[in-house]
């Protein structure tokens, strides 16, 4: 039987103890991180109540299996499937989604390397550069960067996108970007998988658009609120709106029935007055008294003054169409949320 070094046994024991001490265990790839950024990340993680431990992949695997067995949590052992590249163990009290967001927000820019894939579009900005005239001007122009010499310095004539997200950096472009001090790459801890409460989360699950979900939940809340009010389902959030709706409905019925109260008297009189004017419009002018004629004339002037122009009519039609489209999109969003939560 091969002899196992004592330090390896101790390392596995310490890693297993660490895993058992926290509710959230993440496997992260540290292989792309230089020493200084890695030390900064260790500090940030400690400040946020976690710990990062880098070790050999085989020892991490043994530690996970040991911890899973001792905790009686066989699902924890599924993490082993995601050990890859230069793995490290990150333990924390953050939930997996907050942890993923935290690591993404703390990625740092890095210099261009030939053969590397850029995570986002790379733009060379317009303006003067610190570069002196020389062969680099021709090299830039050959790569489609509009450069020329102005006042003894190399100047870029306009903002130029030299790489789209997902494209590979060529050696020639890497030289130019490094000369300009443009750092198109990012270094950080890449999440391989995160374990919490019997579930292993992968990066594709953790990379959610928070604002999109917030918008969906807000729309769902409004739809639920409106539904509850319309079916008179009382809750602390809806009771006031339900009472207001009931009051307005009762008031409308009372007005229609001509039932006089202090709340309805003005509306009933106003309704009768408008009915009187409508009837007066149908009668010959010679049977009307002067007061009624004055009222009809004033009503006609108000109608002319408030008549919308053709441009306003078009704008109203456009607004109505936009409202219909918005209602349709809200219905689609609600349907999507219903599908999401079953």
From Swiss-Prot:
Keywords: Ribonucleoprotein, Ribosomal protein, RNA-binding, rRNA-binding
Gene name for this UniProt entry: rpl10
Residue ranges, annotated region (Required for interaction with ribosomal protein L12 dimers): 212-342
MF term (GO), any: large ribosomal subunit rRNA binding
Domain of life according to the entry: Archaea
NCBIfam families: PRK04019.1-2, PRK04019.1-5
Matching InterPro entries: Ribosomal_protein_uL10, Ribosomal_uL10, Ribosomal_uL10-like_insert, Ribosomal_uL10-like_insert_sf, Ribosomal_uL10-like_sf, Ribosomal_uL10_arc
Name of the protein described by the UniProt record: Large ribosomal subunit protein uL10
